[in-house]
From Swiss-Prot:
Biased composition (Basic and acidic residues): 82-94, 421-436
GTP-binding keyword on record: yes
Keywords: Cytoplasm, GTP-binding, Initiation factor, Nucleotide-binding, Protein biosynthesis
Gene responsible for this protein: infB
Annotated GO CC locations: cytoplasm
Positions annotated to bind GTP: 528-535, 575-579, 629-632
Record localization: Cytoplasm
Protein name: Translation initiation factor IF-2
GO molecular function: GTP binding; GTPase activity; translation initiation factor activity
Region (G4): 629-632
Tree of life domain: Bacteria
Comp. bias (Low complexity): 104-115
Family: Belongs to the TRAFAC class translation factor GTPase superfamily. Classic translation factor GTPase family. IF-2 subfamily.
Length: 1022
């Protein structure tokens, strides 16, 4: 970075938005890295930005993949639009060639029927009706006659000729050059002897040329019925019998790619002035649109009906469209087209210009009238109009849905198209997610090349060769460290994600059947600050709800127990060592708590541990029921507590929040019943259910474990799924065993344990940890195999981790000096208490001192513990346990300190005090007084002695002094002598004269000032 160039900075909220993460999550990570930031709006430098990107690289990669998929989808949509536009152009070009063919065939058919009876009259441009009779091939006529379709005749609409408008039949503009008296639609139907009704015409789809006024020979009406929205055209014809149908030609997306040559046009007289659009009126039938020829000879007469349906379905017509187009192309010879126009006038009398049209030149006809018509209609060739890009852009979505959608089912087809697009999008996103997941290898730390090869789908030989290339010589079963696994996975295009040995060997379970699910009791944890009445509330509930007077029934100290309220409704309470154990369980993923009762003393305040308990409950997604305890005291102030809780984010229902609150007195039992009712209400809202099937392998969570002298390892298990039975083989973490006995909280033996029921389990081979998941296996062999796999991984992990910690410790001590450590051995009654103590002690440390846990275990203090403490210079902390006789004698002999506690907070306070005593004290300078030298005396064998006057303070004989000359320090040391009148004194007060000499310094002068001070040590705090 050059001088004056500012370092680029990033806002935390912008980084979170880029990674699609919560700003609080990014802020918490930045704070963990030791960076001081105030809020999510704070700015960080590039180094911190790099740390965030490296930490959340997986999220960053997922965001990049999502953006890549989105870009590909947009590119694919653009390509689809381009293909649709090209398809539309091809369709328009092909319709230019096919439409004149159909019009020529229709005109020829009309002419052949009406020629014998026609008497042509004079007009500006008279065209014989039989001029195009030979334009229709015989093969096409035979095909149409062979497949007729009968439909009900529809009333024909009469429209005045001057108001005739071009009809638009398609949603897209067709570039065909229209001709006179021709429409680019099919099939055609002639209606005979039908009443004529004058109604408004609807807007058609195809652009059709205007009708040129002809000399009417006879009155007839031609009704043109197209698929979807059709057009009715009334022309002056004299038809003796129904004319054969023209084969239907429907518009389809599957158009021929071949280029159609120009077609010989029909001659016409062009108009000079364009006419304004005529008024459109709706018809009776929306599927029919009619146009009437000029009424010149006394009106129109319907003489017959022509059935043009072929009897085939819409799909078959679409399918055969290409075949018909190819047949027509081979049948007719295509020549150049010329513009055709007509001088039709609108109702306002303005001449309207017709659009150019194309016509097909037929083979040599049998009649000379057709030849004369061809010669008369030759004209000048006109350039085709360009494609209207605006129309294509406006109708591109409809083009994608289906170009030939005119059957009235457009909404359904659009819906199906939308659903199909959604499915394709979901499939693409799922494929991208699967591809991303396939590139992630979930592996345990210190895995072997053989295990890593199986996970990545390659051979172990490839991994060993890659290790050789990296300078590592390994065998197939040798354990790799974390850095090597990450590097090897990256070389093969994978990303390593490390999981614990329990997650790597997790037992897959089937989904619970609906018929096996039943309502289960809620699991409630009581949390709160120390001395706020948590233990008192538990004691009252147990005394009032547990059955008393049972023979030999002594309430056991367990981590969970069950009470019955309202006759048959049960609640399970967790008696954990506090919120520390709750945090440990949540960290292991054991969400065993359904509801949290937050106890707050009404005569106190919301303490920091109360806030911490609230945060733990919210992070676990557990509802909170607030219990305001000690309400019977005179100094109780519930409103103040409610206000403080609202500031902490817990707004009770009375104040418009969602958290229930109950005022209680744990000692007098006030409000306890109402509190239980609110807990049950919260449980009903959550609809807690459990699997009670005996066929399902049971599972549960270890609440706590202890070592009983007569029973061995005893663990308290909270069943979560299935039914736990005596004799079931199981695995819990790295421990295994077989259920030898089940006991409830009163020590009574039971045979079955159901969901949400706490039970004491006997039969563990090793002591499990609190929070481990107990899973019942199908056989003892399966349980042993699974436990051995976990134990191997754990031993390797512990061995590598301990070695690495020692090396790190050596490097740290070389870099920072020797750190003072307080070695501690913990023995407790339960595993849950040990974990709570260990977590609390590890938090008490700073850069100079810390707690080093030498050993921790469950059970009484033994001789082995004493010997270990003596060898490592450690202290022993006994939590609710005592040493045996031999251990006590050995501790007295070794002069070893053993501390006994029953409250976890007392342990933390004493250890914190001990660590503070190990800290180096802070040194402060305390000023005592100042002396001014006013005269110098020369004493033999002593040197210069100053005659002084004490300006302020008190100067003791043993004080440290500094000599100042003109405000500059000249000397710092101690006094050699302090006298008054030849007598040595211990101190001289302010306002007195004295004589002094400095130790090892003789250069003093009149006017110098001597300051007296001393160094004071101050005790440091953690």
């Amino acid at each position: 970075m050059t001088l004056g160039e500012s370092e680029k900075r990033y806002r935390i909220s912008d980084i979170a938005r880029e990674l699609q993460l919560s700003p609080q999550e990014v802020l918490q990570f930045v704070k963990q890295q030791g960076v001081k930031v105030a809020s999510t709006s704070s700015m960080v430098n590039e180094e911190v930005h790099g740390l965030i990107i490296n930490q959340f690289s997986a999220e960053k990669k997922m965001v990049d993949e999502t953006l890549k998929i989105r870009a590909e989808k947009e590119k694919r949509l653009t390509r689809l639009e381009e293909q649709s536009r090209k398809t539309l152009e091809k369709e328009q070009h092909l319709m230019e060639a096919i439409s004149p063919t159909v019009r020529a065939s229709k005109s020829s058919a009309k002419g052949s029927e009406s020629a014998p009876k026609s008497e042509p009259k004079k007009s500006k441009q008279a065209v014989p009706a039989a001029a195009m009779v030979d334009d229709v091939p015989a093969a096409v006529v035979q095909q149409v006659v062979a497949e007729p379709e009968v439909v009900e005749p529809t009333p024909v609409v009469e429209v005045e000729a001057p108001a005739l408008e071009p009809a638009i039949i398609s949603e897209h503009v067709v570039d065909a050059e229209p001709i006179e008296n021709a429409v680019t639609v099919a099939p055609v139907e002639v209606v005979v002897n039908e009443p004529i009704e004058t109604v408004e015409s609807v807007e058609p789809e195809f652009v059709v040329a205007e009708v040129t006024p002809l000399e009417p020979i006879a009155q007839s009406t031609i009704e043109i019925v197209a698929e979807g929205e059709s057009v009715e055209v009334a022309e002056a014809l004299h038809v003796a019998e129904p004319v054969v149908a023209i084969p239907p030609i429907t518009e389809t997306a599957e158009l021929s790619d071949s280029t159609v040559e120009p077609i010989e046009p029909i001659a016409s007289v062009p108009s000079t002035a364009p006419a304004p659009p005529a008024r459109r009126e709706p018809t009776v039938n929306e599927n029919l649109v009619s146009f009437a020829a000029p009424q010149m000879m006394g009106g129109l007469t319907v003489v017959g009906t022509l059935d043009m349906h072929t009897g085939r379905g819409r799909k078959n017509r679409k399918k055969n469209f290409r075949e018909q187009a190819d047949a027509l192309k081979g049948e007719f010879e295509v020549k150049a087209a010329a513009p055709v126009a007509s001088e039709n006038k609108t109702e306002a009398g303005v001449a309207k210009k017709s659009k150019p049209a194309a016509e097909v030149k037929p083979k040599p006809a049998t009649t000379t009238a057709a030849d004369d018509a061809k010669k008369a209609k030759k004209g000048k060739k006109k350039k085709k109009p360009d494609v209207d890009e605006k129309v294509i852009s406006a109708n591109i979505q409809k083009t994608i849905s289906g170009i030939d959608d005119r059957s009235g089912t457009g909404s359904r087809q659009k819906f199906r198209k939308m659903r199909r697009s959604e499915r394709e999008r979901e499939q693409e996103e799922g494929a991208a997610q699967r591809e991303l997941e396939q590139s992630i290898v979930r592996v345990t730390e210190f895995a072997s090349p053989h295990e890593l090869a199986e996970l990545m789908g390659i051979t172990a030989k490839d991994i060993i060769q890659k290790c050789f290339g990296l300078g590592k010589f390994v065998t197939i079963n040798q354990r790799l460290d974390r850095e090597s696994i990450e590097l090897i996975a990256l070389e093969f295009g994978f990303e390593a994600e490390f999981i614990s040995e329990v997650e790597a060997t997790a037992v897959e379970t089937e989904a619970d059947a609906e018929e096996d699910l039943q309502t289960r009791p809620p699991v409630v944890t009581i949390m709160g600050h120390v001395d706020h009445g948590k233990t008192s509330l538990l004691d009252y509930i147990r005394k009032s709800r547990v059955v008393a007077g049972e023979s030999g029934g002594i309430t056991q100290h367990i981590g969970a127990y069950e009470v019955t309220v309202d006759g048959d409704r049960k609640i399970t309470f967790l008696d954990t060592p506090g919120h520390e154990a709750f945090t440990a369980m949540r960290a292991r993923g054991a969400q065993v708590t359904d509801i949290v009762i937050l106890v707050v003393a009404a005569d106190d305040n919301v303490m920091p541990q109360t806030i911490e308990a609230i945060n733990h409950a919210k992070a676990a997604g557990v509802p909170i029921v607030v219990a305001l305890n000690k309400i019977d005291k005179s100094e109780a102030n519930p409103d103040k507590i409610k206000t403080q809780l609202s500031e902490a984010g817990v707004l009770i229902e009375e104040w418009g929040g969602v958290y229930q609150c109950q005022e209680i007195s744990a000692k007098k039992g006030i409000g306890i019943v109402e509190l239980m009712e609110k807990v049950l209400t919260e449980a009903e809202l959550r609809e807690l259910k459990g699997n009670y099937s005996r066929e399902v392998l049971a599972s549960g969570v270890i609440v706590e474990s202890e070592l009983d002298k007569g029973k061995g390892v005893v663990s308290t298990v909270l069943v979560q799924r299935g039914v736990l039975k005596v004799g079931d083989p199981f695995v819990a973490g790295n421990s295994l065993g077989k259920v030898r006995a089940l006991m409830d909280e009163r020590g009574k033996r039971i045979l079955l344990a159901f969901p949400s029921q706490p039970v004491r389990v006997l039969g563990f081979e090793d002591l499990p940890q609190s929070g481990d998941v107990l899973t019942v296996m199908a056989s003892e062999r399966d349980a042993r195999d699974l436990a051995q796999k976990r134990q191997i991984i754990r031993r390797e992990h512990d061995f590598r981790r301990s070695t690495r910690v020692k090396l790190d410790s050596i490097a740290r001590q070389i870099r920072e000096g020797v750190m003072k450590e307080l070695n501690v051995i913990i023995k407790a009654d339960t595993d849950g208490s040990i974990q709570a103590l260990a977590d609390g002690l590890m938090k008490i440390q700073n850069d100079e001192v810390k707690v080093q846990l030498i050993h921790q275990g469950v059970g009484q203090i033994t001789e082995t513990d004493v010997l270990l403490a003596a060898a490592s210079d450690a202290i022993i902390i006994g939590f609710r346990v005592r040493p045996n006789v031999n251990a006590k004698k050995l501790a007295e002999k070794e002069d070893l300190d053993i501390r006994f506690y029953s409250v976890i907070y007392h342990v933390l306070e004493d250890v914190e005090t001990a660590l503070e005593g190990m800290l180096s004290p802070e040194l402060h300078e305390e000023s005592l007084g100042s002396i001014e030298i006013r005269q110098i005396f020369r004493v033999p064998k002593v040197g210069n002695v100053g005659g002084c006057y004490v300006l302020e303070g008190k100067v003791p004989r043993d004080a440290k002094v500094r000599l100042l000359r003109d405000g500059v320090q000249i000397y710092e040391g101690q006094l050699a002598a302090l006298k008054r009148f030849k007598d040595d004194v211990k101190e001289v007060d302010s306002g007195y004269e004295c004589g002094l000499s400095l130790k090892n310094y003789d250069d003093i002068k009149v006017g110098d000032v001597v300051e007296a001070y001393r160094i004071v040590e101050k005790k440091r705090k953690l």
